[in-house]
């Protein structure tokens, strides 16, 4: 049973007026941010579409396959979030060096970031090797455990490729070069779709691997993207003067420490947020196969929408880092407000799509009526948290560009684990609202993060203008 579509014209009008006001004051910075963000957004959307396609393929194979891939993917993302976040420090430092015209320091920094990426890849491989044996301890429905374990055993072989790819990607973004992210994202999608379909269902001469096929295809695409990115940087004339691969350097712990001082709090912050969703997924696994399948449908759609503000936030990080490197605080503030205007606009669009088209979206995933009904309700919650999710992401990006990472880490911890998770547990388990209660906890945690990180941006920017370190 699908829900009636609410009338949200007043909310849309308010958002439109807010965006119009900010653009009227800071419009000159909107266009450069959009030009830098567009390839990043498209690259992230391609990543989101990969998750969407994998879920559609798994969902039409069987509900158990979808549930197993959901648990497996959640546990895959848990160690992936740390290198994703930690290596963002490379974008921050490269953009500031580029803005300060100290490009001779970029090549050595990049080579040390590669060492850090390999170290993080080793940690990721170890985690994915150990965690399948622990699956029964999570209280997940027994039917799901074998498939999730098989998926994790396969995808661990992409542990090194993943952080190396992000290291190269973050370097390019710091240099205002965002098209490789877009091209490799869609290239990976074009390879993954037929490959995962063939391996999951046993088409085009391949054996039927089920959920393992999704893992095999994912690993192959991870390595393909990493190798192609490395070849691009090696052959690119644009970066030839930086001598990225001129020679092999031993690890320099002083430079790696600089990367970790900025990046590790970012990695922990992202782990706090991503971990909230991952643990929520594992807990919803206790409610049964239908609940976890419906949750995954709603979550994958919400994650696809999230790719847009993520790209805008990354572009804002680069532009703010560049402005800070030039000591241009006025431009820094204008870029930040332009980013907020863009995100409010994109999130209004995302929420509108979810509110208007949730039944069509659910039908693309599954023909199971019970799962479809549950997923339709959860998509309405996903529409609500588009705004706090986008705003907290943008605030995080702004603060990263200003090299403020430690206090935001603590604010994220308070918001997600001090507020969002306890409320979700209370509503989901104590009041027996099941997945709906857990999603309300997500909304509250994201809203708290949006408010606190926005406040932090105001405090830090006022200190910078006052000349206070």
Swiss-Prot record:
Predominant location: membrane
Function: Multidrug efflux pump.
A cellular-component GO term for this protein: plasma membrane
Organism superkingdom: Bacteria
Gene Ontology molecular function terms on file: antiporter activity; xenobiotic transmembrane transporter activity
InterPro entries noted in UniProt: MATE_fam, MATE_MdtK
Keywords: Antiport, Cell inner membrane, Cell membrane, Ion transport, Membrane, Transmembrane, Transmembrane helix, Transport
Protein family per UniProt: Belongs to the multi antimicrobial extrusion (MATE) (TC 2.A.66.1) family.
Residues spanning the membrane: 10-30, 34-54, 74-94, 121-141, 179-199, 214-234, 264-284, 292-312, 335-355, 369-389, 409-429, 437-457
Name assigned to this protein: Probable multidrug resistance protein NorM
Compartments in which it is found: Cell inner membrane
Keyword set includes Disulfide bond: no
Gene Ontology BP annotations: monoatomic ion transport
Membrane topology: Multi-pass membrane protein
Residue runs in coiled coils: none
Keyword flag Transport: yes
């Amino acid at each position: 049973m699908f829900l009636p579509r609410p009338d949200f014209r007043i909310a849309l009008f308010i958002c439109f007026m807010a965006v119009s006001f900010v653009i009227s004051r800071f419009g000159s910075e909107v266009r450069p941010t959009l030009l830098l963000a567009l390839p990043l957004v498209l690259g992230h959307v391609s990543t989101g579409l990969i998750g969407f396609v994998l879920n559609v393929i798994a969902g039409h194979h069987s509900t158990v396959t979808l549930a197993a891939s959901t648990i497996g993917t959640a546990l895959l993302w848990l160690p992936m979030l740390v290198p994703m976040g930690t290596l963002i420090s490379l974008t921050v430092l490269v953009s500031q060096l580029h803005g300060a015209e100290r490009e001779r320091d970029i090549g050595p920094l990049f080579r040390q970031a590669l060492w850090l990426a390999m170290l993080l890849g080793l940690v990721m491989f170890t985690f994915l090797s150990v965690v399948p044996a622990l699956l029964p301890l999570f209280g997940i429905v027994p039917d799901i455990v074998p498939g999730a374990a098989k998926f994790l055993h396969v995808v661990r072989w992409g542990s090194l490729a993943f952080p190396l790819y992000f290291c190269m990607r973050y370097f390019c973004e710091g240099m205002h070069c965002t098209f490789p992210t877009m091209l490799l994202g869609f290239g990976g999608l074009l390879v993954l779709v037929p490959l995962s379909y063939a391996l999951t269902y046993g088409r085009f001469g391949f054996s039927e691997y089920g959920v393992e096929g999704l893992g095999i295809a994912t690993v192959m695409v991870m390595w393909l993207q990493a190798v192609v990115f490395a070849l691009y940087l090696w052959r690119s004339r644009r970066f030839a003067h930086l001598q990225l691969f001129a020679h092999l350097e031993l690890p320099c712990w002083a430079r790696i420490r600089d990367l970790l001082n900025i990046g590790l709090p970012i990695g922990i912050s992202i782990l706090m947020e991503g971990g909230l969703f991952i643990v929520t997924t594992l807990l919803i696994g206790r409610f049964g196969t239908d609940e976890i399948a419906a949750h995954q449908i709603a979550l994958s759609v919400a994650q696809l929408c999230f790719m847009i503000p993520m790209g805008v936030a990354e572009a804002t990080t680069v532009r703010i880092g560049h402005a800070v490197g030039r000591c241009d605080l006025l431009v820094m503030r204008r870029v930040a407000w332009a980013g907020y205007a863009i995100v409010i606009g994109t999130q209004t669009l995302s929420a509108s799509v979810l509110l208007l088209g949730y039944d069509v979206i659910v039908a693309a995933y599954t023909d199971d009526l019970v799962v479809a009904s549950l997923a339709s309700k959860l998509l309405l919650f996903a529409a609500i948290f588009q705004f706090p999710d986008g705003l907290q992401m943008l605030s995080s990006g702004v603060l990263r560009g200003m090299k403020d990472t430690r206090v935001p880490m603590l604010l994220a911890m308070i918001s997600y684990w001090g507020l969002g998770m306890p409320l979700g547990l209370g509503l989901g388990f104590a009041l027996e609202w099941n997945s709906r209660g857990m999603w309300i906890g997500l909304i509250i945690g994201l809203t708290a993060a949006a408010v606190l990180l926005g406040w932090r941006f105001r405090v830090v920017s006022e200190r910078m203008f006052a000349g206070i370190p």
